[in-house]
Swiss-Prot record:
(2S)-2-hydroxy-3-oxobutyl phosphate binds at residues 84-85, 126. Belongs to the DMRL synthase family. GO terms for biological process: riboflavin biosynthetic process. It holds the Pfam family DMRL_synthase. It is an enzyme of class 2 (transferase). Pathway: Cofactor biosynthesis; riboflavin biosynthesis; riboflavin from 2-hydroxy-3-oxobutyl phosphate and 5-amino-6-(D-ribitylamino)uracil: step 1/2. Gene3D superfamilies: Lumazine/riboflavin synthase. Its EC number is 2.5.1.78. It comes from the Bacteria. This is 6,7-dimethyl-8-ribityllumazine synthase. The active site is at 87 (proton donor).
């Protein structure tokens, strides 16, 4: 996979930020790792964390919407692995559209840590395990927190 163009931002000054982190439990091993990495990243940056879990990716937007009412930034983590039906496309499109709409409607940044992969190997490679080439739980958290700070500084 290409990391070309990936910004070199590994931390932000998150003291004073409240970050909501919600993760699905479907594809549990992968989602547990994304969840743990998001929490670790937010806490390492000094943010207060409010965390919760949902069953699947389709449940993420409604909980993100609720968290956006009280948080400075919200991170949604999940893992949708393509199967043999078009259900994958419907879930991925619905979740992405929902998370984007919530961010735009609420003015609260939403980090999208929902993996949409063709197989479990691709998901593991992006979930921040030892040996993974990417850490999307951490990356989504940094992106959401950074955006919250940018918005805070704008007139």
């Amino acid at each position: 996979m290409s990391k070309e163009g990936l910004p070199n931002v590994s931390s932000v000054a998150g003291a004073g930020l409240v970050v909501g982190i919600v993760s699905a439990t479907w594809n549990e091993k992968i989602c547990n790792q994304l969840h743990a990495e998001a929490i670790r990243t937010a806490k390492d940056c000094g943010a207060k964390v409010i965390e919760t879990r949902v069953i699947g990716a389709l449940e993420l937007p409604i909980v993100v919407q609720k968290l956006a009412q009280t948080c400075d930034a919200v991170v949604a983590n999940g893992c949708v692995i393509k199967g043999g039906t078009p259900h994958f496309d419907y879930v991925c499109d619905s979740v992405t559209e929902g998370l984007t709409r919530i961010a735009l409607d609420s003015g609260v940044p939403v980090g999208n840590g929902v993996l949409t992969t063709l197989n479990e190997e691709q998901a593991i490679d992006r979930a921040g395990f030892d040996g993974s080439t990417e850490n999307k739980g951490a990356e989504a958290t940094i992106a959401a927190m950074h955006t919250a700070l940018v918005l805070r500084d704008l007139p």
